[in-house]
Amino acid sequence: MLLAYTVRPSNWSFTRRAYSATARAFNQQKGLLPLPIKETVDMAYDLHLPERSVIGKMPYHSPEPIIFYHGLLGSKRNYRHDCKKLATALQTPVYTVDIRNHGSSEHALPFDYNTLVNDLVHFAETHSLGKVNLVGYSLGAKVAMLACLKHPERFSAACIIDNSPEEQPHIKPLLTALVKSCVKLLDHHNVRADDKLWRHKASEALKKYIPDAGIRYYLLSNIINNPRVVEYRSPVINYDDGMLHFKNPVRHMMDFVTKEVAAWPTQELEGKQFLGPVNFIKATRSDFINPKSLQAINQYFPYHNIDEINATHFILNERPQEYLRAVTDFFKVTRYQLEKKREQDLAKIDQLNASESLKSARD
């Protein structure tokens, strides 16, 4: 029997601190209730264990589990079936998490890449996971890359799905449109939660801004129309007002998508590399990974592989079997090929250093 455990944070104690000037000014301008400030949050998660284990009963803390990190406006629920398959195919536990301001996790500031990396490290430490493998998609992919570069001792390997380690001003319009369309749905279309046609009306409202039906379906998966099923009650969302709401504090997230989502801390990461194996899955009809991205990928991740799949950026929804096969093949085969190449390169360096030392001693 396949096992899955769901855990939600409860009884959070909020750290009361002054907001950053940017966040405070933005919230005041929009007349928003303030989000609490927390350096780290305990992310909600699902734990998926293999359906059939070749080693009998799988221990809870198996070596090198996988943490699956979703994208902007995603959640662990979107990929629970995929992660169940991964757990069985790879015979390892797979944790799917909700990042802050998503799914069942706490709504809090700051909401930036460094904070999301801190949440990830906090999660691994809290659950005593040791070294782990990462699978990240879109926003989650950028967090995974940053985590590997800033904390290489904590991560063994990573699978990066359609994102690259660089500044990406060209992706900002798409991601801004996603969040802005959600805000417009709430602010300009009074769809009641008890309306039997709420899903159709919400989809039609989003259609004005998001013509792609698949993307609208992705966004609609975040809507709450029944306050009794809310797993986390946000301090800035009134679930009992009879209207539709998103699981995300989308109004508060606009500052992130306009200023942070396309960023990359080039200066902070100068000279840093992650020497573990990394697999990039590129969607061929997406520009999140483009020819110019290869230089940055080579710079930060010298032991990498790139798989290509015919899809748009929403590759997980469009090509689930193909991307799962690519992830599985990487962790089963390609990662070990890359590790072997790394060991060969290190052996050559050691040999050269030994030769230089011997030559110096003779001189």
From Swiss-Prot:
Its main location: mitochondrion. GO terms for molecular function: acetyl-CoA hydrolase activity; carboxylic ester hydrolase activity; transferase activity. The active site is at residues 138, 162, 313. It catalyses: ethanol + acetyl-CoA = ethyl acetate + CoA; acetyl-CoA + H2O = acetate + CoA + H(+); ethyl acetate + H2O = ethanol + acetate + H(+). Residues 1-19 form a transit peptide. InterPro entries: AB_hydrolase_1 (IPR000073), AB_hydrolase_fold (IPR029058). The gene is EAT1. GO terms for cellular component: mitochondrion. It is found in: Mitochondrion. This is Ethanol acetyltransferase 1. Keywords: Hydrolase, Mitochondrion, Transferase, Transit peptide. Alcohol acetyltransferase that catalyzes the synthesis of ethyl acetate from ethanol and acetyl-CoA. Can also function as a thioesterase by hydrolyzing acetyl-CoA in the absence of ethanol, as well as esterase hydrolyzing ethyl acetate. Residues 65-164 form the AB hydrolase-1 domain. Belongs to the AB hydrolase superfamily.
